[in-house]
């Protein structure tokens, strides 16, 4: 596996996409300081997973992106890609099958990085995993910088150990161990959660068991309620059946009355139907007469309209005939006028046509003479333009000479002034004064910088102290939160126990509490709280005294005896604080001997012996009197002829004494825990005060630092200003001397040039006089040609004008003649049409009176017929009115009958609706019984004879009251109990699985530790051996070794012991810079010989070495290049000569790096050739 290429784009100074080919095993990068060589090292470190901006010489990850220059804008993204040849398959895992692997990292301005392997988006961890065990990594020994040399050799033992672990390839083991520990931690957390959940589920199971029993009783009551409800519904059904019979009888009566009204209505409707038929006949007769009447009226109207239209036509024909005669006469006159004009125009045209030919010939001759004159004028214009060009050139040269002379004269004046100014400026420069001012400013700046450095060190130390104090405060705060959580848990447990104790003492009984409050006994102690029982006998005491735990302790019971009868519900026991004599029993120890209290209780424990075992109790039972008994620790209570044991887990008094002891212990623990919280709060408060004081000190010191910094900046600015003034003055002095010399030379040159210009200007003045004479001759010639041209143009224009006017007159006469001929033809056609129309109109008028007389006669006949029809129509309308009146009377009678029928029908429908309602209620009851799986007939058969609705309603109410007294019932308690029980079993199984998994993970940790120890020991021995071998080769003698700081191979650090030749044993810190560098090189190469990384980057490692040690260093690198690919950055010629390929980094454009590559073998061959 070896590196093939490095692609950079937008990374630091490599703004343009840049490809760096890595050829062979020895490559060197050279270039001046600041050109970007080390940016290549940063790029490689960054792409293989470096996350610290400080390691990349930046403040944030976005600093690696090109930030722009004076001529280039910043870019938004940086990208680096490394190409590896993996043909040997050294990179294992899923990428072992790839012969070439490309790893790319990109970052944008938001600082978010993206990683790619062979183009696929991956995580940073995937990139780091690729190089695990190969010796490559962002902090591995494969990338060695100049600063890293001293860091490596002076590293802490635990930091130096990391390099040996990387060489051993056990970094993947450590990663696996971290993952395993993380899984163990998560498994343990899961196990703790399972334990907590299981404990909570156990409590839920006990609670749900009680709820499930109540649910069973509730179901039994509900079943009884269901049976009674079914019988009650059957009773209701029977009552509804009786109502149904009554409704059927009433419906039959109403139905008979409705049928009577229907018969009467049918008769009336028959009469109405007959009257309607009669009315229809009369109506048809009326319609027929009316139709004839209105038809005749329409005929009369049409005749009247025809008469009117005929009269209008006759009037129109007469008007048209008169207009026709007027137009005919006008057309006759117009035709005569047009024929006269035609004769006149034909005569004029015969005289104009011969004259047109003569005028056109004269115009052509005038145009020819004009063309000759224009040609003469054009030739003169050409000659004039040539003369003007020659004159212009002479004038231009003369003007140039005048301008040059004026320029030289002004230049001479300016140069003389500049010379005087330069001489004056040289005298004004004050170099000595600036040097005197710079010296004290420089001393003051050095003093302020020293003070700033001291303040900065103090600020750094104070910042570390503040960070440490903050961490301590955070630890205290976390501890306080833990203590508070524990206190809250204790208080919650105590509250729970107090609630149980209050329930056991009857304090939750509202009526009893009210009575005690009324007697001011609410705060009096209870007997159960005043008993102290010897350990082990709590169950026995609870068995005997459980009914007296809630007894109220009073000084005297007598004052309350009268009010005891006012207790409405519940039980109240009062105990007086008096001594009670107890009978002596000597058969065995008594139960009273196991109880202590200042309140009397012996009367309730009199005659009760105790026995440790059941056998002892049996022995005592045979000798017991009637008022004696014996009880065991387990609560088995035996009398002479009886035995009792109480296991009422649900009873409030169960476990009362144990809970009381636990409650007392919890209260003591709460006080202790509260004290711990107070101590932690005080400690946190003290830490916060210290932190505030430290921050105040830091702010004060920061103000001092800022003040010093501002003062130093001011002094440095003044120093820079004075230094710049000095540099400027020195540069100005040099420039003034050079300028003075140049000014004198320019004055001499300018004087010589002015003499030449004056001579040439005199020659041009002579030429200008000759040109003026020639100009006057050409102007006289131009005036002659211009006068001749004007005369000929006027003549040609006059001839063309006469020809045009004659042509226009001829064309106008011909057009007018054609138009007149067309007008005469059109008028003759109109005269013919008017004659034909006049004859037709005369014929219409002669025949128009006959149709008008016929129409008037027909109109008179139809008017007489309309009068007859009017009389007949009035008679028919009278007959129709009489029929309608009779029909209305019958309709009114039918409406009254219909109203009575509707009332009867409504009453019938009301009865039917009532019957339907009863029937629906019956059906509903039957359906309800069916839905509840009851059969009506069966329930009716089983129903007792004495059953009534009232008695069954009373039974149901009583049963419902019993159910209500049970209070809220969790019907799902049975299923919840089974579900929680199933979950509890599952959690028990999960607990076993987690315990097994935890054991497996612990075994895996032990195995990883064994492998790590073995691998580390083996690697350590080999590296130590190689280090002891390489050190003398590099130093030319001496010895060195590695030592472990501890015997534990998992945590032991590694230190370096080195003794250069000729020196006694010294610590590594006493070596010189060159000796440290050589020692570090020996150690790095020892690691490489054991586990060679794919490539090694050496960044100016040879800088602190002299020539002899550089030679040794190069010889060693040359030998190792047979196994390892090297990329060396150096300024040393010896190191550079060793490389096979050279790559130069240049910065021709400020802030932008570029690569130039040279093959050394080819270059040497070219030189030798």
Swiss-Prot record:
Report whether Ribosomal protein shows up as a keyword of the record: no
Coiled coil stretches, renumbered: 170-507, 659-1030
Q: Which InterPro entries match?
A: P-loop_NTPase, RecF/RecN/SMC_N, SMC, SMC_hinge, SMC_hinge_sf, SMC_prok
> What Gene Ontology molecular-function terms does this entry list?
ATP binding; ATP hydrolysis activity; DNA binding
Which Gene Ontology cellular component terms are annotated?
A: chromosome; cytoplasm
Q: Which residues bind ATP?
A: 32-39
List GO BP terms, alphabetically: chromosome condensation; chromosome segregation; DNA replication; sister chromatid cohesion
Q: Which Gene3D superfamilies match?
A: 1.10.287.1490, P-loop containing nucleotide triphosphate hydrolases (3.40.50.300)
Write out the similarity annotation: Belongs to the SMC family.
Q: How does it assemble?
A: Homodimer.
Please describe what this protein does.
Required for chromosome condensation and partitioning.
This one is known as Chromosome partition protein Smc
Origin organism is Coxiella burnetii (strain RSA 493 / Nine Mile phase I)
* Source lineage: Bacteria, Pseudomonadati, Pseudomonadota, Gammaproteobacteria, Legionellales
């Amino acid at each position: 596996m070896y590196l093939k290429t490095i692609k950079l784009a937008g990374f630091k100074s490599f703004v343009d996409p840049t490809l760096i080919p890595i050829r062979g095993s020895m490559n060197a990068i050279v270039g001046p300081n600041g050109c970007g060589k080390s940016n290549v090292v940063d790029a490689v470190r960054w792409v293989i997973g470096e996350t610290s901006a400080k390691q990349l010489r930046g403040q944030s990850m976005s600093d690696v992106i090109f930030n722009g220059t004076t001529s280039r804008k910043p870019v938004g993204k940086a990208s680096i890609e490394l190409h590896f040849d993996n043909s040997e398959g050294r990179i294992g895992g899923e990428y072992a099958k790839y012969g070439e692997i490309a790893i790319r990292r990109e970052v944008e301005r938001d600082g978010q990085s993206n990683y790619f392997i062979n183009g696929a988006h991956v995580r940073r961890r995937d990139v780091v995993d690729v190089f695990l065990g190969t010796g490559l990594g962002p902090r591995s020994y494969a990338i060695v910088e100049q600063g890293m040399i001293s860091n490596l050799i002076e590293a802490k033992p635990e930091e130096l150990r990391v390099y040996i672990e990387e060489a051993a390839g056990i970094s993947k083991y450590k990663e696996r161990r971290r993952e395993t520990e993380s899984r163990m931690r998560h498994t343990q957390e899961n196990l703790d959660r399972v334990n907590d959940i299981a404990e909570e589920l156990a409590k839920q199971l006990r609670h749900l068991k009680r709820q499930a029993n109540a649910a069973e009783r509730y179901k039994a009551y509900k079943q009884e309620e269901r049976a009674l409800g079914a019988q009650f519904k059957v009773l209701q059904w029977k009552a509804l059946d009786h109502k149904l019979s009554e409704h059927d009888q009433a419906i039959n009566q109403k139905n008979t009355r409705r049928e009577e009204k229907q018969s009467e209505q049918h008769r009336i409707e028959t009469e109405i139907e007959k009257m309607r038929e009669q009315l229809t006949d009369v109506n048809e007769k009326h319609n027929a007469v009316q139709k004839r009447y209105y038809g005749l009226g329409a005929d009369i109207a049409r005749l009247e309209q025809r008469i009117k239209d005929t009269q209008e036509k006759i009037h129109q024909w007469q008007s048209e005939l008169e207009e026709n005669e007027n137009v005919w006469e006008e057309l006759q006159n117009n035709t005569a006028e047009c024929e006269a004009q035609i004769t006149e125009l034909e005569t004029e045209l015969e005289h104009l046509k011969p004259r047109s030919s003569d005028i056109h010939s004269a115009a052509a001759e005038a145009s020819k003479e004009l063309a000759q004159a224009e040609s003469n004028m054009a030739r003169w214009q050409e000659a004039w333009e040539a003369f003007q060009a020659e004159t212009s050139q002479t004038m231009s040269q003369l003007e140039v000479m005048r301008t040059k002379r004026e320029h030289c004269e002004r230049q001479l004046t300016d140069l003389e002034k500049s010379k005087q100014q330069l001489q004056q400026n040289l005298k004004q420069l004050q170099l000595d004064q600036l040097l005197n001012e710079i010296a004290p400013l420089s001393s003051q700046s050095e003093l302020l910088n020293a003070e700033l450095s001291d303040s900065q060190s103090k600020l750094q130390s104070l910042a570390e102290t503040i960070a440490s104090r903050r961490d301590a405060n955070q630890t205290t705060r976390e501890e306080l939160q833990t203590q508070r959580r524990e206190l809250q848990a204790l208080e919650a447990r105590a509250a729970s126990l107090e609630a149980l104790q209050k329930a056991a003492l009857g304090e939750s009984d509202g009526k009893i509490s009210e009575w005690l409050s009324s007697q001011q006994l609410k705060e009096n102690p209870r007997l159960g709280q005043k008993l102290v029982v010897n350990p082990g006998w709590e169950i026995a005491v609870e068995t005997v005294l459980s009914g007296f735990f809630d007894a109220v302790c009073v000084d005297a019971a007598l004052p309350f005896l009268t009010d005891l009868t006012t207790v409405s519900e519940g039980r109240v026991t009062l105990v007086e604080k008096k001594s009670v004599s107890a009978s002596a029993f000597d058969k065995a120890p008594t139960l009273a001997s196991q109880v202590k209290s200042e309140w009397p209780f012996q009367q309730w424990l009199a005659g009760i012996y105790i026995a440790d075992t059941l056998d002892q109790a049996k022995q005592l039972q045979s000798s017991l009197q009637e008022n004696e008994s014996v009880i065991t620790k387990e609560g088995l209570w035996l009398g002479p002829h009886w035995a009792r044991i109480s296991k009422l887990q649900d009873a409030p008094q169960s476990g009362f004494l144990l809970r009381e002891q636990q409650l007392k212990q919890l209260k003591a623990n709460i006080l202790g825990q509260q004290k711990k919280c107070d101590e932690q709060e005080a400690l946190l408060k003290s830490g916060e005060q210290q932190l505030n004081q430290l921050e105040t000190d830091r702010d004060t010191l920061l103000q001092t630092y800022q003040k010093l910094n501002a003062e130093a900046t001011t002094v440095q600015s003044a120093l820079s200003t004075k230094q710049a003034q000095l540099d400027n003055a020195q540069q100005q002095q040099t420039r003034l001397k050079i300028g003075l010399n140049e000014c004198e030379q320019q004055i001499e040159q300018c004087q010589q040039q002015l003499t030449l210009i004056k001579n040439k200007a005199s020659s041009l003045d002579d030429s200008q006089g000759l040109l003026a004479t020639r100009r006057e001759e050409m102007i006289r010639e131009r005036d002659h040609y211009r006068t001749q041209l004007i005369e000929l143009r006027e003549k040609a224009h006059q001839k063309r004008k006469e020809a045009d006017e004659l042509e226009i007159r001829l064309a106008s006469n011909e057009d007018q003649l054609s138009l007149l001929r067309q007008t005469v033809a059109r008028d003759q056609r109109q005269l013919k049409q008017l004659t034909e129309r006049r004859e037709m109109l005369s014929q219409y008028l002669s025949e128009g009176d006959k149709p008008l007389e016929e129409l008037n006669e027909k109109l008179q006949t139809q008017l007489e017929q309309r009068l007859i029809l009017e009389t007949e129509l009035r008679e028919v309308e009278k007959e129709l009115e009489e029929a309608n009146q009779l029909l209305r009377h019958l309709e009114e009678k039918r409406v009254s009958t219909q109203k009575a029928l509707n009332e009867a029908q409504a009453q019938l429908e009301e009865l039917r609706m009532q019957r339907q309602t009863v029937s629906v209620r019956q059906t509903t009851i039957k359906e309800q019984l069916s839905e509840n799986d009851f059969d009506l007939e069966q329930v009716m058969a089983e129903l007792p004879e004495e059953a009534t609705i009232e008695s069954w309603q009373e039974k149901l109410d009583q049963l419902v009251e019993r159910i209500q007294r049970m209070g809220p019932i969790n019907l799902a308690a049975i299923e919840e109990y089974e579900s929680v029980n199933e979950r509890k079993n599952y959690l028990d199984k999960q607990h076993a699985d987690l315990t097994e998994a935890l054991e497996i993970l612990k075994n895996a940790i032990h195995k990883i530790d064994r492998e790590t120890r073995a691998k580390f020991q083996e690697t350590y021995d080999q590296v130590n051996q190689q280090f002891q071998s390489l050190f003398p080769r590099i130093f030319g003698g001496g010895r060195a070794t590695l030592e472990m700081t501890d015997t534990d191979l998992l945590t032991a650090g590694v230190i370096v012991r080195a003794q250069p030749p000729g020196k006694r044993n010294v610590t590594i810190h006493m070596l010189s810079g060159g000796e440290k560098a050589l020692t570090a090189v020996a150690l790095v190469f020892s690691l490489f010989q054991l586990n060679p990384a794919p490539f090694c980057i050496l960044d100016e490692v040879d800088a602190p070495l002299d020539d002899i040690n550089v030679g040794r260093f190069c010889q060693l690198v040359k030998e190792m290049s047979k196994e390892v690919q090297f990329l060396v950055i150096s300024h040393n010629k010896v190191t550079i000569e060793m490389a096979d390929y050279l790559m130069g980094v240049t910065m021709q454009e400020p802030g932008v790096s570029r690569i130039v590559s040279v093959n050394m073998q080819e270059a040497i061959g070219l030189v030798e050739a």
